[in-house]
UniProtKB/Swiss-Prot annotation:
The lineage of its organism: Bacteria, Pseudomonadati, Pseudomonadota, Gammaproteobacteria, Alteromonadales. GO terms for cellular component: cytosol. NCBIfam families: PRK09194.1, proS_fam_II. This is Proline--tRNA ligase. Consists of three domains: the N-terminal catalytic domain, the editing domain and the C-terminal anticodon-binding domain. Transmembrane segments: none annotated. The gene is proS. Catalyzes the attachment of proline to tRNA(Pro) in a two-step reaction: proline is first activated by ATP to form Pro-AMP and then transferred to the acceptor end of tRNA(Pro). As ProRS can inadvertently accommodate and process non-cognate amino acids such as alanine and cysteine, to avoid such errors it has two additional distinct editing activities against alanine. One activity is designated as 'pretransfer' editing and involves the tRNA(Pro)-independent hydrolysis of activated Ala-AMP. It comes from the Bacteria. Homodimer. PROSITE patterns: AA_TRNA_LIGASE_II.
Length: 571
């Protein structure tokens, strides 16, 4: 491809509203252009990368036995009403009406559509298992689109769905798709982790997310330094301490703590470490077994953070987790938020495992500006239930018993689920089994963010000059930069000959034939991230050589022109 016939569209300046490096570089390198909030046009360079990612995904889906289909983006509302998600989904589901005032949605996902399809197309167990996928544009009306294509409203996604008669069959396909996802990210050469995850609004049983490690990631993932264990921090179990609670050695004492509302303030005032205190959070839940609304106390060690997902799965706690208002706390407990503690509370108390082994700890006294020192479980706080309700921390023992946990940020680029019969039951999707009995199907669901992978790859592969593409998804393999070509017939001839040779050999090459200064040409090739650059200059031509530069390593070397085509073929 000649740059004179190409829409290169590079920019020198970094757009002010681009927060993360991938967004900045995708705009500067001419990969995308913003149309509106969360909506982007893919320019030729970006589309070449996007298509390469999609092709790798397609190849691995085909290898895993999945069949490609294409479903409508616009979906009738009645399918979503049948599944129950019409009411469950929030405003991120874009609801529209046609000219006949019938309700439709712009699809964020396709569980309902594919289930309806299989219900009508598959009638016998002999047609199972069935695994289908599509690569398609999705739309989710994000409340705050950000980070460019990483969290846009419109995005390209591969979603696959499998149908089975048994859990065993579903498990096998799930494992096959898990392996296929690993191959996708390995082929692109990304550092990633498959992690145990929560199913969220999709529903179902087993679930794994695939995260590309990057400082700009929105998710914290915990993984062992000695095994393959990895989990989203929301799902990682915080093991109970391997020691018993010490016996009390101090008297319960009230101390004045004026204006000390936070753990940090109380710890500083009383000169104690935060881990020797507890904090008490009040949430809404069932006050008794009659289902009446009341308050529940969640108690954590002072230096630990509440895991809302774990907390809302405890019997009696409302989901989604809802914090009590200041007025509710004042009415029930008689103090403000910063002075609450588990001693003498007349509401259910749930203590995290790490808090439950403390002795002689500091806590709120349920009086404004007053705390207890020397508080102890059973002696002072008599009624409580132990549970895992905190986030794990770096250095915690790994839940699989091997090594300790590290915490890193991750960008979610894939998610697979075992859905079970959630959608097939709702839409009555089943077949006659070998005994002639109607059986509802088990389902699996497997998503990859194709456009998000492009951004995630940049987050892992860049320097101060621009993008450093992994070879598998680079828009071009080789760039030809002829310095001052329009002033030298000799340089032009060598460049044209090399361009023709590489094209004939099937190499994707970007030939910079613009009338630009060499510095501009070099900067653009580095910004765009072409892995290999051939620089043609007068001085080296005197020795029948050209200069080769590797974008990733920065390595430079002189190559004899007669050996150049063979050299490029080895890259």
């Amino acid at each position: 491809m000649r740059t004179s016939q190409y829409l290169l569209s590079t920019q020198k300046e970094t757009p002010a509203d681009a927060e993360v490096i991938s967004h900045q570089l995708m705009l500067r390198a001419g990969l995308v252009r913003k149309l509106a909030s969360g909506l982007y046009t893919w320019l030729p360079t970006g589309l070449r990368v996007l298509n390469k990612v999609a092709q790798i995904v397609r190849e691995e889906m085909d290898r895993a036995g999945s069949l490609e289909i294409l479903m409508p983006v616009v979906q009738p509302a009645d399918l979503w009403q049948e599944s129950g998600r019409w009411d469950e989904y929030g405003p991120e589901l874009l609801r529209i009406k046609d000219r006949h005032y019938r309700d439709f949605v712009l699809g964020p996902t396709h569980e309902e559509v594919v289930t309806a399809l299989v219900k009508n197309e598959v009638s016998s167990y002999k047609q199972l298992p069935l695994n289908v996928y599509q690569v398609q544009t999705k739309f989710r009306d994000e409340v705050r689109p950000r980070f460019g294509v990483m969290r846009g409203r419109e995005f390209t996604m591969k979603d696959a769905y499998s149908f089975h008669l048994s859990d065993e069959c579903l498990n096998k396909t799930y494992d096959d798709m898990f392996a296929a996802y690993c191959r996708v990210f390995e082929r692109i050469n990304l550092e990633f982790r498959p992690v145990i995850a929560d199913n969220g609004s999709i529903g179902g049983n087993a679930s794994h997310e695939f995260h590309v490690l990057a400082d700009s990631g929105e998710d914290d993932i915990a993984f062992s330094n000695a095994s393959d264990y990895a989990a989203n921090i929301e799902k990682a179990e915080a093991l109970a301490p391997q020691f018993s609670r010490p016996a009390p050695s101090a008297e319960l004492t009230k101390v004045a703590t004026p204006n000390a509302k936070t753990i940090e303030q109380v710890s500083a005032l009383l000169n104690i470490p935060a881990e020797q205190s507890v904090k008490t959070l009040i949430v809404l839940g069932e006050a008794d077994n009659k289902g009446q609304q009341g308050l529940i106390a969640l108690v954590l060690r002072g230096d630990h953070q509440l895991n809302e997902l774990k907390a809302e799965k405890i019997d009696g706690v409302y989901a989604p987790l809802t914090m009590a208002s200041e007025a509710q706390i004042e009415d029930t407990i008689g103090c403000s938020i910063g002075s609450i503690g588990p001693v003498g509370l007349n509401i259910p108390v749930i203590a995290d495992r790490s808090a439950a082994v403390l002795a002689d700890f500091v806590c709120g006294a349920n009086e404004n500006d007053v705390h207890y020192t020397g508080a102890n479980w059973e002696r002072d706080a008599k009624e409580f239930q132990e549970a895992d309700i905190r986030n794990v921390q770096a250095g915690d023992p790994s839940p699989d018993g091997q090594g300790t946990l590290e915490i890193k940020r991750g960008i979610e680029v894939g998610h697979i689920f075992q859905l079970g019969s959630k959608y097939s039951e709702a839409l009555n999707c089943g077949v006659l089994d070998e005994n002639g009995k109607h059986q509802v199907l088990n389902m699996g669901c497997y998503g990859i963010g194709v456009s998000r992978i492009v951004a995630a790859a940049i987050e892992q592969n860049h320097d101060k000059y621009g993008i450093i593409w992994p070879d598998a998804i680079a828009p071009f393999k080789v760039a030809i930069v002829p310095m001052n070509m329009h002033k030298s017939h000799r340089i032009q001839q060598v460049a044209e000959d090399l361009y023709a040779q590489l094209k004939a050999a099937g190499v994707e090459v970007l030939f910079d034939d613009r009338k630009e200064r060499p510095g501009v040409m070099f900067n653009d090739m580095e910004l765009v991230g072409v892995p290999h650059t051939i620089v043609i200059g007068e001085r080296n031509l005197d020795e029948q050589k050209v200069e080769y530069k590797n974008r990733r390593s920065g390595e430079k070397q002189l190559i004899d022109i007669p050996q150049l085509a063979e050299f490029v073929s080895t890259l």
